[in-house]
Swiss-Prot record:
Family named by the database record: Belongs to the GcvT family.
Gene Ontology CC terms: cytosol; glycine cleavage complex
Organism: Xanthomonas axonopodis pv. citri (strain 306)
Protein's recorded name: Aminomethyltransferase
Enzyme Commission designation: 2.1.2.10
Entry's transmembrane regions: none
Function: The glycine cleavage system catalyzes the degradation of glycine.
Secretion signal span: none
Pfam families, A to Z: GCV_T, GCV_T_C
Entry-linked InterPro entries: GCS_T, GCS_T_bac, GCST_C, GCV_T_N, GcvT/YgfZ/DmdA, GcvT/YgfZ_C, TrmE/GcvT_dom1
UniProt keywords, alphabetically: Aminotransferase, Transferase
Gene3D superfamilies hit by this protein: Aminomethyltransferase beta-barrel domains (3.30.70.1400), Aminomethyltransferase fragment (4.10.1250.10), Probable tRNA modification gtpase trme, domain 1 (3.30.1360.120)
Amino acid sequence: MTQKTILNDTHRALGAKMVDFGGWDMPIHYGSQLDEHHQVRRDAGMFDVSHMTVVDLHGARVREFLRYLLANSVDKLKVSGKALYTCMLNPQGGVIDDLIVYYMTEDFFRLVVNAATREKDLQWIGEQAARFDVRVEERSDFAMIAVQGPSARTKVIDLLDPADTAAASKLGRFAALQTRSRDGIELFLARTGYTGEDGFEIVLPQQAAVAFWNALLAQGVKPAGLGARDTLRLEAGMNLYGQDMDDGVTPYEAGLAWTIALDEGRDFIGRSVLESQKAQGAPRQLIGVVMDEKGVLRHGQTVLTANGEGEILSGTFSPTLGKAIAFARVPAGSIEQLRVDIRGKQVPLRAVKFPFVRDGQAQPGVLGD
């Protein structure tokens, strides 16, 4: 049965076109995906991300547990509210999910995991947590709203309790704080996002979500759907689980080497596979590609390289760049003379460094200059 977020009726009242996304009835756009994309790049837009799963972990050994569970090191988290992006791996080094972990207290950490992987994540985390005496609590009582764009933080801070605005203004990237709105709504405010823009992801009680969404609307924050969220994250070079990586792909093959911490004396699930892959080199790599000819790059298209075939993973027409862009997984070392097979025609591709877009602007080399 399709699940609905607490904001479902609100989306429909705003004229949203709804689609099934990982078993959830979600807005794809509210009229124009293109306008919503530009709104986030130029001002501020908001997304209902209440389908994401918040998992609270409690116990005296929770840090020890996360040192074992995650490929990145929670030992980097020393200040309450600090966040870390990481992969959770299987024993073969494959990515079960990518997630954000927040350090709350020494016996309380919070995870935010993907919606489509909820069941397998909860099962895996629960199985691994048992021997560490860690209590796993899914917070289905929460909703989540992401407000993103150059003006996003200002518009959100204007809605906070005046006693909290100074702390919220000083909040660094990849950090969170517990705060409240002017109306007394408890908010977990995280300076994170999935668009490449600045902003906040806000976790709040479900019963307060509609009122807070409407307060953001009154601030001039425009709603944006999953369509714009996808083109924004793609321009920003951010992976989508299930499309750009899965449990048969290691972080080294997903462009996520930077999330692996091979710190001494820490044994984490999948570590031995990653160590040997680092020493020998991963057989495949994830790259960004741009197509200068007209057309659209789509998932599953074959990429031809001097070292063998690869494939397009996420692909779209970039509204900011005016060109087709994509992630591709290709044999290691293949970044020259790339071509994509589009209905039997071989079209040239250029490999570029991530991200395609930063702070609303094309990154050097992306446009071919």
